[in-house]
Amino acid sequence: MDDILLEIFHCYRLDIPWGWDHKWWYKLMHTCRRWRYIILESSSSLQLHLYFTHGKPIGEMLEHSPPLPLFIDYGKTEMSTKDEEGVLLALQHHHGRVRLINLREPALQKLVVVMGKPFPMLENLKLISLDPWYCSQLPETFTAQRLRHLALIQVGDVSAPGVPLLASITGLVTLSLRGISSPTDLPVNYLVSRLSLMPLLELLCLEFDSEPFVFRSSSPGNVKNDLAALQTQMAQLSKLDEFIFEGHCRYLEGLVSCIRAPVLTCLTLSFFTRPSIPLPRLSEFLTAAEELRYPACSFTFSGPTEENPGVSIVVAGLEEFSPEDAPFRIRFPCRRIDTQVACAARVSTALAPMLSSVERLHLEYYATRWHKGLPPPIPHEAWFELLRPFSNVQKLQLETAMIRKLSFALCPEDGPPAPEGILPKLSKLIRPHHARFEGMLDPFIAARQAAGQPISKRRCPPTPNSDSEDHDDPWSWLASQLADDDEGSTELDSDSDFDFE
């Protein structure tokens, strides 16, 4: 009978949405003495714990509750004086029971002082400082051998040279270091040496402060020597599933040259400056990450008058998703459209191992405010370099500004036509809805037709409530799915590769 009750308690716990109710077992314990005995005897399997957060009477809970693991969660807002006193009590006298710590400044500066002792049960540690002025740092005597999840946000252990906290932790499953003041505070060689001792790592997040970065003891143009100097140790991250990086592309090049992540399925990259160097190490890294292959890709360029002009590249499956949830994302700032395309081409070359699996490609130019004057011309070779890795693309979708810009390269009035190796498997071209785009790219299509590679044309659905052709919505390609047939450019396209809304 006790086993049946215990199974019911397990089901009751699992039925709680997202596990947000930390006191689900309180009422059950007060039902009767028998239930209380069963629950306390099975506290480990039922994952019982005391949850301390804002307004909780920690002293009373510690005095009158069974010796269960402690969750200390004050990471959302500032703590009151009474909360600080309660947390100090728990950290000083019950550190052997603490399983989760989530603290933030300004109270963090006082609380870390008493953490210079072993925390044998601690599995989850998150320390937050929204202002690096506090510079809180864990004592050197702090240890947590069972730590599985570590997140430090602008905390002194990140900005201190060498990140000493990492020196004693080997069993991490997730590691998030954000607000790192400078790459010199976290040398690639040191980071790789620590990552090599974390075989269970599934998520790695590195976010630097957006400050100018100069590679230590190297000139800006000596990239090969920089990378050669880093080849001292390799970290085999056989379980790494997600990698998030925000910083300088040169640091990323050094890091990915020293790690392997064969089962990586999610990659998010954000560069502080446009990529000014080739990215061969990133290309090698992606070659080894064989799981990072998806059939749809989107390039979004933005106008110079936008708040943060730049390029965004998204790669994902064909199912609906939002850009924030896409398994692969990369973004870098850049103002001029010609430089955007040139840098995107450089990135496209680096991403060739994964872009070769793409079957559907979408090119978009986003601008809410049009700038005066003619945009700078885009070299044809930049377009060819951008498109060359897409050897398997069957469908190309172009938005209003993109079809104009790309047509100059694919259908030049003078000069040689586009090379045969550009989009060799293309069979469907989706153009903007309005009739003025009807004949664009026809010479390119005719050349492919003559070569025995026919390309059918389709139109995007019209934008709802559009009063004129000049109000073409850049997201019109996501309009309702309509029937697709083979009557050329007079029909609307039915395929919807992405849904960003």
Q: Model-predicted segments: where are they?
A:
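Leucine-rich repeat
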Residues: M1-E501
